[in-house]
Amino acid sequence: MPIRHCIVHLIDKKPDGSPAVLHARDSELAASDAIENLLADLNDSYNAKQGKAWGLFHGESGAYPFSGWLKQYLDEEKDFATFSRVAIEHLQKLMEESNLSTGGHVLFAHYQQGMTEYLAIALLHHSEGVAVNAELDVTPSRHLDLGQLHLAARVNLSEWKNNQNSKQYISFIKGKNGKKVSDYFRDFIGCQEGVDGPGETRTLLKAFSDFVEKEDLPEESAREKTQTLVDYATTQTKLGEPVTLEELSSLIDEDRPEAFYDHIRNSDYGLSPEIPADKRTLNQFRRFTGRAEGLSISFEAHLLGSKVEYDEEAGTLVIKGLPTQLIDQLKRRKD
């Protein structure tokens, strides 16, 4: 993972309305194994976070100046240290306006992964721990706690520069349960939500369910293809990459690699060729299966409570919205 530029600043602030004190670094961090390891661990932690949002920059303005400074840096009108300095001063101002904000070390990193360039910005905090020193004494030890990553954003610079119609070149961590504590950080980046990750994922899963029903796939085949979809999408979320519909289609059916993709294109699902999958939504798409005495039942977990109702005391399932093929067979049997 080639790191182009990296720098860390410190904003000292407590969530009590006190002033935010900036301790800015003047020069970039020199390349080192420690920096490589830090960024690799940060990427892993960020990719694993659930509940991220995807979007795009607001139009450049006095309220949202970040994208303009970033463009000046990419156009080589500002060096990286200068860009990060004006950005961190803006973040300091927004922190002071947000009484609930807490300071910390702010990392700016411009790096490349594969053929794609990214800018990562993260507010990092320390945790207290212990270590054993060379004399085998147990001593206090402070370390950056990447497991408690609550404020971070990543800009896909390549996508931003090369695809003006994209609405998902920025990802950022959203506040839990609608909390407004992180709003100042989103305003700092100047980001607006452009893609509803959970909604897009639900639409993708709906399209897949429709595809399975339309193809009238055997239970084993449906289960295998469901697992393929979930495994691929989960892997993409871990890598911080979107789900590519054409690639997914080829994995679902190697003999007919375009079948699922054509199903999506020919129906009114409104999905983009690439979508940011939501891990929490994917976890709801597991299948329940059971077989006994000539009876075989298989359904997706997210249908439980809507189309499928389970009565634990009675040991029964109530299924609503039966497949058309099954209804036709039952009618013919009755006749």
Curated annotation (Swiss-Prot):
Keywords: Cytoplasm. It is found in: Cytoplasm, Nucleoid. GO terms for cellular component: bacterial nucleoid; cytoplasm. The keyword Ligase does not apply. The keyword Magnesium does not apply. GO terms for molecular function: double-stranded DNA binding; single-stranded RNA binding. It comes from the Bacteria. Belongs to the YejK family. This is Nucleoid-associated protein PSEEN4449. It comes from Pseudomonas entomophila (strain L48).
